Amino acid sequence: LKVPVPVDDVPAAVVPFRRRGLVTVVRLPLRNADARQEASRQLRELTDDGAPFELFLDRLGKVTVTHRVGGRGRPSVYTRKVDPLFTAPGLKIQQITLRRRMRLIMVTAAVHSERAHEAIAVGRESGPLTDGWQALGDSAVVSVAVPAGEPLERGRLYTFLPMGAQPTCPVRGFLNAPFHTDVSRRTMAESTQWNDLLLDTVAEACTQAVVLRYGCTCHQRSAAARATSASY
């Protein structure tokens, strides 16, 4: 990558964006056939509904992806709708609706601050983590999303965007956390106490969500039974 610079003359390909009122347009020319092939591969991967890129981007409103071939292209629009289901200190459960009405139940949990600082300190002392990781000690969260209907055959790890197919996700869902990864953010780095803590937090969050779900159901049934008994 090179440092972007403003241009004096607006390229013809950018003019339609200006007419639509867009303020910032970044145009990256592809230098050769290999670069074009790689860009096409990444575009196909990005728009693969098997691992929706927009799932954990909670500030996202809408993304339109248009792949033009021979001057023609059909836009694909990606949106994200959130419906809160349950909120408790350090935990929230939401229903996420994506394009094509794909619905998922998402559980998001805060990482315990004391355990986070301890894991980061260990990682800094042993080498994998740098000083910049300290900021996550009080703000790290993990999320796991599962389809509202049939479960996935295989899960996928995310670091905000989908990682590669390896390593294997421990749940049949989509799992997002600020993992320590390689530079490409596609594979896990070596085993670290930090990554282990994030996975433990996911397991604890799922357990808590199940207890809350069925605990509420049992409480409601008990209340209904008491009301029925009282009526007799």
Residue ranges and their predicted role:
Residues 1-232:
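GHKL/Bergerat-fold ATPase module
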